Structure formats: C-alpha cells, structure tokens
C-alpha cells in the first residue's frame, strides 16, 4: 500500500494531537491520582479553616490546618493572629468601615496544610498572648465571615 506524503503528515499531526491530549489529561488528573484538590471558592456553608495541630518550630510554632478550600493569597486565604491582642473583627482591612473597630495586625498566607508563624503572627510579637487564631479571608483581605474562625491555646508549646 502506497501512503502519500500528505497522509503521512496528517497521521503525524493527529499523533501529536493525541499525545497532547494524553499529556493534558495526565497533568489535569495528577491530583486526582493522589490527594484531593479543593476549590478556592467557598462552599455553600462558607469557607472554613481549623487548627488541627501545633508543635514547636524553633522559636516559632508550626500549625497544621484543615480547610474546606484551597487557599491562594491572591484569592481566598488565611489570616492568623494572636487572640488576646485582636478580635476576629479587627483582623481584616474592613475592620473600621464594616465592624467599627480599630484594625489590628495579622499575617496573611496560603501555606497549607502546615504553616510556621511569622510576621504579625510570630511568637516574637505575641506580648504574652497564648491563643493563636485563624480565619478565612478574601482577596481584599477582609474576613469572609466573622462567625467562622478557630482559636487554639498554645502556651504549652511556647
């Protein structure tokens, strides 16, 4: 059987397209083969994050989180702060405009599932505080829902 050059090129092109499809499918399904990939968007019940574990990490603390969304600091992410220093209403950019309270200090991040305290959540700035807190925040660094936050007493790790 004689195959024309045009047919051979066409078959080669289809072969590349097929391999590209396999590659895209494999890359896209990579996480499906291992851990579950969570959306960044909040579910119907809202974005939630909890501190499941705490352990020393040098002079800082390593927190282990459980969340129902995948954090991204340019989208929905986490705010961590010292609970004795600020309320959940204070740890967002809309503290004064929406909640009528003085804006506090927090550390924004998307480290997941573990995070080591730093910045405004560092142990070096806790000033005697012994409760670390976390809450979901949006891309504008506003707390998504001030009723949804989690705090853990950590004095035994300091």
Residue ranges of model-derived segments:
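Short, compositionally biased P/S/T/A/G/V-rich stretches that sit at domain boundaries
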Residues: 35-58, 66, 157-158
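Bacterial N-terminal signal peptides
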Residues: 12-27
């Amino acid at each position: 059987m004689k195959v024309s050059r045009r047919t051979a090129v066409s078959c080669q092109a289809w072969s590349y397209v097929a391999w590209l499809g396999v590659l895209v499918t494999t890359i896209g399904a990579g996480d499906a083969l291992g851990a579950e990939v969570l959306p960044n968007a909040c579910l119907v019940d809202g974005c939630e994050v909890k501190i499941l574990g705490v352990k020393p990490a040098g002079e800082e603390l390593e927190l282990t989180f459980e969340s129902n969304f995948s954090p991204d600091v340019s989208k929905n992410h986490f705010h961590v702060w010292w609970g004795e220093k600020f309320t959940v209403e204070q740890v967002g950019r809309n503290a004064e405009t929406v909640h009528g309270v003085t804006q506090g200090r927090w550390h924004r991040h998307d480290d997941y599932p573990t995070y080591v305290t730093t910045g405004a959540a560092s142990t070096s700035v806790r000033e005697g505080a012994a409760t670390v807190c976390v809450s979901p925040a949006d891309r504008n660094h506003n707390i998504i829902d001030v009723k949804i936050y989690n705090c853990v007493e950590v004095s035994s790790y300091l």
